[in-house]
Every structure is written in structure tokens, then in C-alpha cells.
């Protein structure tokens, strides 16, 4: 009888794994939590966050890697549209610069706007510091920040009266206004 690994028993390790019982990186753990096929590139997770965590996971020592465990559930469902992913990529480059990493120039700079490059670059900037305990904590907080970015709210096509308040409250207010503006006889004539 073989023992199967679940998200509750898997230990985080470096690299890509063919199956959970052989270990899992933080992204593979996230795929398990998202109930997706076992992969280090789950569809429901932001590509920028995924790139950051794949690189960071593989560069950490085994002890600090386990600190990534809570992030796996946090990042499920973070995949978003272009605007949010561009903002995440931009923040990754800012995070890198804040850690002292110079951004590439010339043609290489153009590629930094992609999810894979910007996320990996930010993780590498953190890993270059050792990472120190302070930078490790900053990296964990940075992932939380990236995960909290939501798509901008678009203009709704519904009338404000419909989405602005509880419909029951709107009906009560309309009836109260009707009662003030019409007499009892007029109301009976309407019924």
C-alpha cells in the first residue's frame, strides 16, 4: 500500500515534480489547492506571481521554503486581466530596484515587462541578498501585496437605483412616497 500525498502532507521542495508524493514546489501546491491538474503553472494563478514564486521557491533553503506554504492558498484565483498583470509586473520591477538590482538596458529592458521576466527578476533580486531575514519577510509581504491587487471596477451598465441599495428598501421608500402624495381614494381607484 502506497501513501498518497495531499496538500496537507506535502513538503515544499525545489524544482518541478511529476507527482505530489515526490514533493511539490509552492506553485504545485497551489495547483492542488485550486483542484487543477498537478503543475507549477496553474491557470487560476497570476503569471507574475507564479514567476516570482517559482524562482523564489527554488532559490531558498529548505527551512525558509516552508514559509511559502501559507502563500499557496492566498494566490489561488489571482489570475487577472492585462491591466492588473501589468501593474504586478511594474511593482516587481520597483521591488527589484528597491533591493538594489539594476534593471537591464537596451533590448533586454523590453522583455522585463513580461510576467515571467518581471516576476523572476524580482525574486532573483531578493535571493541575491541571501536572502536576509529582513528581505525574506519583505518578499513574503510583497507576494501578499501582489495577490491583493484586484481588477479595476468598470462602469456598471445597471441603473444606480438598482445596484445602489437594497431593492426592498427602494420599494418601501417608493410606497411611502406614494402614500404621502396620494389620498386614500386615489389609491383605491388604482387597485
Model-derived features: positions:
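Leu/Val/Ala/Ile-rich N-terminal alpha-helices, chiefly Sec-type signal peptides and the beginnings
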Residues: 2, 7-59
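Structured binding/interaction patches within domain cores
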Residues: 37-191
Amino acid at each position: 500500500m502506497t501513501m498518497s500525498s495531499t496538500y496537507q502532507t506535502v513538503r515544499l521542495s525545489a524544482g518541478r515534480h511529476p507527482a505530489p508524493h515526490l514533493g511539490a514546489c509552492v506553485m504545485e501546491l497551489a495547483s492542488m489547492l485550486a483542484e487543477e491538474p498537478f503543475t507549477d503553472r496553474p491557470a487560476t494563478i497570476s503569471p507574475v506571481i507564479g514567476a516570482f514564486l517559482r524562482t523564489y521557491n527554488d532559490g531558498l533553503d529548505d527551512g525558509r521554503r516552508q514559509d511559502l506554504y501559507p502563500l499557496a492558498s492566498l494566490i489561488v484565483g489571482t489570475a487577472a486581466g492585462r491591466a492588473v498583470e501589468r501593474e504586478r509586473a511594474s511593482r516587481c520591477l520597483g521591488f527589484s530596484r528597491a533591493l538594489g538590482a539594476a534593471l537591464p538596458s537596451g533590448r533586454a529592458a523590453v522583455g522585463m515587462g513580461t510576467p515571467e521576466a518581471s516576476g523572476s527578476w524580482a525574486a532573483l533580486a531578493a535571493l541575491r541578498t541571501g536572502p536576509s531575514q529582513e528581505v525574506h519577510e519583505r518578499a513574503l509581504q510583497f507576494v501578499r501585496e501582489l495577490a491583493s491587487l484586484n481588477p479595476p471596477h468598470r462602469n456598471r451598465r445597471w441603473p444606480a437605483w438598482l445596484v445602489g441599495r437594497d431593492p426592498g428598501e427602494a420599494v418601501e421608500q417608493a410606497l411611502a412616497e406614494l402614500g404621502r402624495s396620494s389620498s386614500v381614494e386615489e389609491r383605491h381607484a388604482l387597485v
